[in-house]
Amino acid sequence: MKKNHFLQELSISATQKRNGANNSKNDVLKIQSWLNLFELVNSGSGTLTSIDGDFGPATEKAVMNFQKAQGIIQNGVVDAAVFKLLCSPLQTAFETIPTGNGLRQRIINAGKLHVENFPHELIIKNKSNSGPWVRSYMDGLEGTDMFWCMGFVQAIIDQAASSLNKNFKDLMPSSFSCDVVGEEALAKGLLTRFAKVRDDPSVVKPGDIFLLQATPHDWTHTGIIVSVGNDVFETVEGNTNNDGSNNGDRACKRIRNFRKQKLDVFSIEPLV
């Protein structure tokens, strides 16, 4: 994969524990982030704690609650094995080789796999769009202005393309900007405007990318089309929510009515 920052999210430099001599603020931040992400999926697990880089009694107890949930020794210490359990959703999402007949099906399957592992942003140091999932999609970047929907899309396409020894950069520029990608699609003749999509939905194929149009040269959100119906696309999207926001807090599978929304479509056919 070309987008491989996720590898840095899968390990810590040394065992971390309360008052540990080898404690690293960066490692503790990772641990606290995953403890919070675990609680989002496992409500009531008791692993919510501050994300401040300090391995104090609260973090120790949160680790013990995580260890209890996993059925392992409850000592409050995070070694390599415990951290591997903490970050296992991200490892599963990024390191599972997509399967399927051809690139389009592999893109769809990779997208679904990521969503099933619940990619979710966190608020760290009062900044949204933060945490290990966001950094993985955004090549290490995070923070309030780091809208990560395009990073999510490109990570999925990269993962699927790499499984077939293809380079996603042959299709589109490596950019987190919907506008940059949209203009490239226009220049290559790969962008079908929403009006034509409404007239003839058959021009759209699963695995293609939608770009939500604000104006003809301004796009505010993106995602991968999983299936096409008469009126709707089923999609997988990052940085969204149940309302379809372009700055939500998670990746999810959605249904969008392309007859009511201005959804331009970027064809991935040249990479197929």
Which residue ranges define each predicted feature?
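Conserved hydrophobic/aromatic packing and binding residues within compact polymer-binding modules
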Residues: 63-66
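Short, basic amphipathic alpha-helical segments that act as recognition/interaction helices
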Residues: 83-89
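Low-complexity, Gly/Ser/Thr/Pro-rich intrinsically disordered linker/tail segments
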Residues: 248-272
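Secreted/periplasmic proteins that engage bacterial cell-wall peptidoglycan
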Residues: 33-34, 57, 61, 112-201
